[in-house]
Amino acid sequence: MREIINVSVSHRSNHLITQFYNCLEPLLHDADQENDVFLNPNIDKVSKTVSYTPRALLWDAKLGNGSLGTYQYVSENDYADTLDSEQGATAKTAHRVQTHDRIRKSPYQLALDQGATVLPKINDEIAKYWSDYSKLIYDPSSFNTLQDWYHDAANQQKAPNFQNLRQVYFDNYETGSNQFRENYSNEFFDSNLHQQLEKCDSLQGFNIITELDNGWGGFSSSMLLELKDELPKVSYHTYGWNQDDVCSLKEPVHSTKTKFQMLCNKIRATIALSQESDLFFPLYANTKEAFWRSTGETVLLFDSVNSVFHGSRKQAATNSNMRKMSHLTNALTLGESKRNIVSKLNVDEYNSFSFYDRMPLYKNSKKPSHTFTQCEIDRVNHKESSMFHFTTYPWTNSDTIPDTHHSCAESVIGVTEKPRDVLKTWEDLVSRYFRYDSDREEIKDHLGTLSLEYEHGWYDDDDSDLDL
């Protein structure tokens, strides 16, 4: 067994993980599939059945789990609506403390709980929370919550706010980094992470999914640093959400204080996470769409990449080495461990899922960008697999995926020259605008050194000033 644990950090990331596990759910009926890579099997010897819970650790702010109680499917007393319907002494003697307005289950989740054969169609109104349409039941050890920060359902795109007062937000890299180190590190490693690790026979690695533009980037950076210190021999693939910023939109850097802060967060988080990860995937976060819809599109890429590690038992003996996270890392980096930003993220004819494709060319960059390495993930034609060509099982669609993204035949991921445009642009920006930051020179050095990893051929030394 080669288990992979998904560590999902932020509300947006939890939507992506929900979509991913919803797409895995149909595979549970296929005995040939190695479902225990991403799912933990629980065997009932009496009924001779097996149930699965996701190998996942989900981080969210308070209220981010919506109507879902941590022990809801373990103990009914964890869910307020159950108390309402109960009769007898338990309901009469129960003492309830209400700290916020109750979040009701969505019609979709109610239909799932009732075993309905026909489920309501997903839309923006009934899928505000990832728990509104989650098909699998999580183990209580999967849930982790920021105790002093609250999710605001009315402003989904905003970072969590302190004590639900909507005055101070979780929108700073340093705030997130300090929060994990000072308040959550010991408990997380000793409790929930430890419980998930105990359920693995031969862990091969972690997927880290996080946002980069706010405090979650710093939070994840500190977490990954300690994870690598604790488990240095496993693989780490990080998927970082990037919202459009002043660079991608070609706006003045100081157009607003908030936009400048977002860019500072993104730069620091990208440096920290890419340095500690085996592979780093810069995802585009579309803030104009509801979370369920945008992540329902992005899951085509995420599911395709991870389908490489989750396959047929019949083929396991013949291509087991090629279905490891470490093999994909080697195929994309070819031993150049510092050149690990996977900037080409394409699925079929859909728009690119890479944020870096939205960034303008740097002053003297060439177009198109050179491709250092590229891997194809084939989900239809089933050609023979090779080091750079992976044949996996067909895409299994879920009814929670938008109608516009119901098919997935081939994904192409690669390491290109494009990160140089991004890193050099950021290096110029840091030189000009990080005037009083204590880590200014360190960030400049990191960006300059890292950009060299993505250079190919010769460049014109006559660089005109960047108009930011």
UniProtKB/Swiss-Prot annotation:
<dbReference type="InterPro" id="IPR019605">
    <property type="entry name" value="Misato_II_tubulin-like"/>
</dbReference>
<protein>
    <recommendedName>
        <fullName>Protein DML1</fullName>
    </recommendedName>
</protein>
<comment type="function">
    <text>Involved in the partitioning of the mitochondrial organelle and mitochondrial DNA (mtDNA) inheritance.</text>
</comment>
<dbReference type="GO" id="GO:0007005">
    <property type="term" value="P:mitochondrion organization"/>
</dbReference>
<dbReference type="InterPro" id="IPR029209">
    <property type="entry name" value="DML1/Misato_tubulin"/>
</dbReference>
<comment type="similarity">
    <text>Belongs to the misato family.</text>
</comment>
<dbReference type="GO" id="GO:0005739">
    <property type="term" value="C:mitochondrion"/>
</dbReference>
<dbReference type="Pfam" id="PF14881">
    <property type="entry name" value="Tubulin_3"/>
</dbReference>
<keyword id="KW-0496">Mitochondrion</keyword>
<dbReference type="Pfam" id="PF10644">
    <property type="entry name" value="Misat_Tub_SegII"/>
</dbReference>
<dbReference type="InterPro" id="IPR036525">
    <property type="entry name" value="Tubulin/FtsZ_GTPase_sf"/>
</dbReference>
<dbReference type="InterPro" id="IPR049942">
    <property type="entry name" value="DML1/Misato"/>
</dbReference>
